[in-house]
């Protein structure tokens, strides 16, 4: 089975994580895909950042969901990079690789589904260009209920068998196991059930 090179939060060994520059570097390095994390801003924009606050990554402070997009854009990562929106990442990638969107909390699912649907219907993308993943299985269930064409990845760091059962229920495309669950036996178990392994 083919090994995919997925740039976790972009090529963060070269550029600050979850920035347009990190994602561009991943494209330059011919990554098969990128992984990123999303939260919602106070005014409903999908923001690409790992933490629920901007404290660690920027020169600002505060929770992402309490700040508007203009406020978030006013703070910089590594003194020069803006926090990107998911739209900006989609436009940058432009169908060149897979985009794995990790929902960091429940309230992001409907906006992400709407955005993916828009790019498929209006910009000639395919659903296969995306995979939506989360530790919040309730959010993944809602993604499945809204649009069964969107590929789903089930994240787990504890019970692999439970994750496999849930993945079968929602017809997921992949299992995203935490690294300590990754051994030959578990990898084989996941693949035998027809799922991709995307740790």
Per-region residue spans from a language model:
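Phosphate-group recognition and catalysis centered on beta-loop-alpha active-site segments
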Residues: 1-199
